[in-house]
Amino acid sequence: MTAFRLAVENGYGMEFDLHLLKDGNLGVMHDSLLNRTTGQAGRIEDLTTEDLKNYRLENTEDTIPRFADVLTLVDGKVPLIIELKPEDGNHAKLSETACNMLKGYKGVYCIESFDPRCIAWLRKNRPDIIRGQLSENFFRDRTDLSDTLKFLLTHNLANFLCRPDFIAYKFADRNSTPSNWLCRRLWRVQGVSWTLRSKEDHDTALKEGWLSIFEGFRP
């Protein structure tokens, strides 16, 4: 929670990832696997809400937060970009649970996901929520997907089903597909670049018309 608290204190919006826990609640962590962030084996999807307090993050006193705790802390003070990270086909349940928890929340927020099924769910069930499709050049890093799926996701070909309000594309890959240009220029879909780690990249993204998701510096 320290990073979220500092973001609020400095007036920065924040982006974070949601996972569906074993008991149906939501936990906030980047990876499904626990080892990189906590040093312990397992998946966050196999934990309960009570379990979260037993997993310390990056050798700090912070433990894995609940989504409810983050909403209480922020309390509408800064905007939120909420990423849904489904596992094992739980995209619909994850999307529904997140939206239910956001009912009554007074702050500014949007929801994004790499999984087009989450974005399609939002379009059908909560079209009032700003939704974004996350993407990158999947041919560069991903070995767990078929070439067909890599092609579809890299070139934003699910967008005709999802109709995202914005596309959040990896900064280094932003010129990998003409679909980014088409979506932004012809259909006026806002482009967002992630994750920017220098002021130079931040300035370049803004100059090219991309909004910025950044870390590690003050723009």
Question: What kind of region is each of these model predictions?
Answer:
Residues 1-219:
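Phosphate-group recognition and catalysis centered on beta-loop-alpha active-site segments
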